[in-house]
Regions:
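ABC ATPase nucleotide-binding domains
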Residues: 1-61
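Secondary-structure boundary/capping motif
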Residues: 5, 45-46, 79-80, 149-151
Length: 188
């Protein structure tokens, strides 16, 4: 499949043709396309370059559609300008009023930090060469487990049952609990 994707991209570039490629495979969508259209039940959700859509999803459906491993989804709440995942206050969100939200955190949005604000149960560590995948859990997580990708040079205490993280704000997305539309919180 990877070789086929490479051949399709090579033919597109050589012939300079416009191709409409329909797929449910997000890896194909990300790797072959210059522009993608994400649809849900026949309704267009977002149009953009693969990187734009990944970095700037308009809603929770789009955020969950793109990315391998997938985005980690939590139930969260905004209280007095702070984002809480359970009892963990993880980020300042002064521009957002108090409410319940869905929180999406990309796997690369975690920073391993000994006393980081997000305390998780460590399930296992997977060495992937240049990266390490930390598989953990948290009571507020909607996924069966949290997948965080960190640099392999980071040191993970595998003897511990706990792992703590800080979060990269540009990899954290807030979504309305009812409509699942993204809530802007980082921009002025």
């Amino acid at each position: 499949r990877l070789q086929t994707r490479e051949e399709i991209k090579k033919i597109q570039q050589a012939t300079k043709i416009t191709t409409v490629f329909v797929t449910h495979d997000q890896d194909e969508a990300m790797s072959i396309s210059d522009m993608i259209v994400v649809m849900n039940k026949g309704v267009i959700q977002q149009i953009g370059s693969p990187q734009e859509v990944y970095d700037d999803p308009v809603n929770l459906f789009v955020a969950k559609f793109l990315g391998t491993p997938p985005i980690n989804v939590f139930r969260g709440s905004i209280k007095n300008g702070r984002l809480y995942l359970g009892s963990d206050a993880v980020l300042d969100t002064p521009k957002v009023h108090d409410q319940e939200v869905f929180v999406g955190i990309r796997p690369e949005g975690f920073i391993l930090q000994k006393d980081g604000p997000l305390a998780c149960t460590l399930n296992r560590v997977e060495v992937m060469g240049r990266d390490i995948s930390i598989v953990s859990s948290h009571p507020s997580c909607e996924n069966s487990s949290i997948r965080s990708i960190i640099n392999a040079e980071s040191i993970v205490d595998t003897a511990s049952s706990k792992v703590c993280f800080a979060l990269k704000p540009d990899k954290v997305f807030l979504f309305d609990k009812d409509s699942e539309a993204r809530i802007e919180w980082r921009r002025s």
